[in-house]
Regions:
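Catalytic cores of large soluble enzymes that bind and process phosphate-bearing ligands
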Residues: 23, 67-71, 87, 91-94, ...
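Cytosolic-side membrane-insertion boundary helix
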Residues: 57-101, 107
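Core alpha-helical transmembrane segments of integral membrane proteins
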Residues: 85-168
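Generic detector of multi-pass transmembrane helix bundles and their immediately adjacent loops
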Residues: 152-292
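Soluble N-terminal domains of membrane-associated systems
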Residues: 1-73
Length: 292
């Protein structure tokens, strides 16, 4: 820790002191645990705020003494809070997923890869997937159940809305039964899963979890446009509305394969990070013990 500031009696509710300081990301989790052992989170509160730039020799020294590297560090409390938020079934989640699924349905009708990418980016489902991975690693059954419920209800509503819209469009003559072409060279992958579907889902799941733990949200865009969850859901809805029964099984399988791959890879990634960081902290503790 560096640049420690103590303001005695500054807090009013609850009454107490205000303590601030710069902490290397690598040491944040250890310090949070120490504060929790003192019941600071119950008697007061612990707040974290990222600092983009700090020009300070003391801060540089604190970072040098911290174990590992900042980009590799995982602040488990931060991830805990974030994944709790992502388990909640909100109107925003359902609306975004429904809009993304409708875009995917239009992409299937027009054989448009651009719309497929748009639907992938708009889909909000990865947050709930990450919450399930976190729940598995920390054996939080309640979190897993809530996240699974959010995913299930969200996709069910999104598919139902897209299905109804496709039916109405068919009834008013906007689209016809033959509108969904049998040959779609640009978007056929939506309903034809293969071994690469699972491989891509594994890679995307690992990358997605790493982007969350490292605080690199920009990498999530690459995750969104790699997996075929939302496009498969959109194609499923349109195929049912236009009676293209041969594509239904493939769409369902593609959706499940992508979800399973991301869940597996995300969980394994968190397990590895937890183990590696535990070893790094033990080594740092041993070094401190020898130098004191």
């Amino acid at each position: 820790m560096a640049n420690l500031v103590v303001l005695p009696g500054a807090a009013r509710r609850p009454a107490g002191d205000l303590v601030m300081g710069d902490v290397a990301r690598e040491s944040a989790d250890e310090i949070i645990e120490a504060l929790q052992e003192l019941d600071v989170d119950h008697d007061g509160s612990i707040s974290l705020d990222d600092t983009d730039v700090t020009v300070s020799d003391a801060a540089d020294e604190a970072e040098r003494r911290a174990p590992g590297h900042g980009d590799d560090a995982v602040i488990w409390e931060e991830l805990d809070e974030r994944t709790i938020e992502d388990t909640r079934l909100t109107w925003a989640f359902v609306v975004f997923l429904a809009l993304a699924t409708q875009l995917a349905g239009i992409a299937a009708l027009t054989d448009s890869p651009i719309l497929v990418v748009g639907a992938m980016v708009l889909g909000p489902e990865f947050g709930a997937i990450a919450a399930i991975c976190f729940g598995v690693v920390f054996r939080d059954v309640r979190r897993i159940g809530r996240a699974l419920g959010t995913l299930t209800v969200g996709f069910a509503v999104a598919i139902a809305v897209t299905y109804v819209c496709a039916l109405v469009s068919r009834w008013i003559g906007v689209i016809e039964l033959h509108q969904l072409p049998a040959s779609r060279p640009l978007t056929q992958f939506i309903y034809t899963p293969d071994r690469w579907s699972f491989v891509v889902a594994l890679l995307a799941g690992a990358a997605g979890v790493l982007s969350l733990t490292a605080g690199k949200s920009s990498a999530l865009v690459g995750v969104f446009i790699s997996v075929t969850t939302v496009p498969a859901a959109g194609n499923l809805a349109v195929a049912m509305a236009l009676r293209h029964w041969s594509e239904i099984d493939g769409s369902v399988l593609q959706l499940l394969v992508n979800l399973a791959g991301m869940l597996l890879a995300g969980t394994l990634t968190l397990l590895v990070q937890r183990g590696v960081w535990h070893i790094a902290r033990k080594r740092q503790t041993a070094v401190r013990a020898r130098t004191t």
